[in-house]
UniProtKB/Swiss-Prot annotation:
Residues 120-127 are annotated as: BH3-like. A motif (LIR) lies at residues 49-52. Retrotransposon-derived protein that forms virion-like capsids. Acts as an effector of BAX during apoptosis: enriched at outer mitochondria membrane and associates with BAX upon induction of apoptosis, facilitating BAX-dependent mitochondrial outer membrane permeabilization and apoptosis. Required for death receptor-dependent apoptosis. When associated with RASSF1, promotes BAX conformational change and translocation to mitochondrial membranes in response to TNF and TNFSF10 stimulation. Also promotes autophagy: promotes phagophore closure via association with ATG8 proteins. This is Modulator of apoptosis 1. It comes from Homo sapiens. The lineage of its organism: Eukaryota, Metazoa, Chordata, Craniata, Vertebrata.
Length: 351
């Protein structure tokens, strides 16, 4: 019934039902502002939308609302339910016809590759271009061949078109077009869940949305771990830019964060950095003092207390920057590993 209501409502407004949503289960007492607030939170992954109207349904003793979208969207992005005043609201959506969707995406992909459907058919091992519609094949024979084509091309088709993430920089005063962290994180998390692509492609799309300090954080993490996952990237951004502890609690946490047994010094520095950047963001540490603050805590928290001497850092010299410190530590760790390997070889020769 609700899908039919969506179709009839859209027909009465001369609009495409696949560019609209019906929100059902809304409390009678819910105001327009409360509906808008719930839509803003629940429909963030869909991009732009507009509340077009409301209606009371006597059989449910509830309101329904019609929401217009700027374009047809993927079924994977549309939530089945969203939280609203008085409980959970149902989201009714008329998905695109799967055959038409696949064929349009297939044709678009082939056009970009300079291929025809007939050439694709031959590439898949079908003689005489049997996938080509002009061959006059009966519809029943298309199904298995289309399924094979879909399986072969699915990775490329998934990457062909996607909604880009909103932009986030982590700057204290976001520039025009940039989101504040909370809204950006919610939207990004929802979008990433919906993407049916490999993690490496998700990470590429995530990096595409980052600017300024936020991009710098992920670049540094990638230097230490080139295979860092999207979830790890989001966790790091949450630690640096998310609103959590007050400055005093954060400072105590920073000063009591020590290197763990068997933990590499470089890993400790990377674990410490998000806390330090939070303190800088909240004004607890001046930006021009951040390098010295980092070095002081690394020396205080390291398992080996001779680390300053091991890294050849003078007592009265300027503290190295983050990347410079990591390079020094990496070189030190590499030298230690090489020495341990040589020692093991020598011991093996004399036993």
């Amino acid at each position: 019934m609700t899908l039919r209501l969506l179709e009839d409502w859209c027909r009465g407004m001369d609009m495409n039902p696949r560019k609209a949503l019906l929100i059902a289960g809304i409390s009678q007492s819910c105001s327009v502002a409360e509906i808008e607030e719930a839509l803003q939170a629940g429909l963030a992954p869909l991009g732009e939308y507009r509340l077009l109207g409301r209606m009371f349904r006597r059989d449910e003793n509830r309101k329904v609302a019609l929401v217009g979208l700027t374009a047809e969207t993927s079924h994977a992005l549309v939530p089945k339910e969203i939280p609203g005043k008085g409980g959970i609201w149902r989201v009714i959506f008329k998905p695109p016809d799967p055959d038409n969707t696949f064929l349009s995406r297939l044709n678009e992909f082939l056009a970009g590759e300079g291929m025809t459907v007939g050439e694709l058919s031959r590439a898949l091992g079908h003689e005489n271009g049997s996938l080509d519609p002009e061959q006059g094949m009966i519809p029943e024979m298309w199904a298995p061949m289309l399924a094979q084509a879909l399986e072969a091309l699915q990775p490329a088709l998934q990457c062909l078109k996607y909604k880009k993430l909103r932009v986030f920089s982590g700057r204290e005063s976001p520039e025009p077009g940039e989101e504040e962290f909370g809204r950006w994180m919610f939207h990004t998390t929802q979008m990433i869940k919906a993407w049916q692509v490999p993690d490496v492609e998700k990470r590429r799309r995530l990096l595409e949305s980052l600017r300024g300090p936020a991009l710098d954080v992920i670049r540094v993490l990638k230097i230490n771990n080139p295979l860092i996952t999207v979830d790890e990237c989001l966790q790091a951004l949450e630690e640096v830019f998310g609103v959590t502890d007050n400055p005093r609690e954060l400072q105590v946490k920073y000063l009591t964060t020590y290197q763990k047994d068997e933990e590499k010094l470089s890993a400790y520095v990377l674990r410490l950095e998000p806390l330090l950047q939070k303190l800088v963001q909240r004004g607890a540490i001046e930006r021009d003092a951040v390098n010295q603050a980092r070095l002081d805590q690394v020396i205080a928290g390291a398992v080996h207390k001779t680390i300053r001497r091991e890294l050849n850092l003078p007592e009265d010299g300027p503290a190295p920057g983050f990347l410079q410190l990591l390079v020094l530590i990496k070189d030190y760790e590499a030298a230690e590993e090489e020495e341990a390997l040589l020692q093991a070889i020598l011991e093996g020769n004399f036993t």
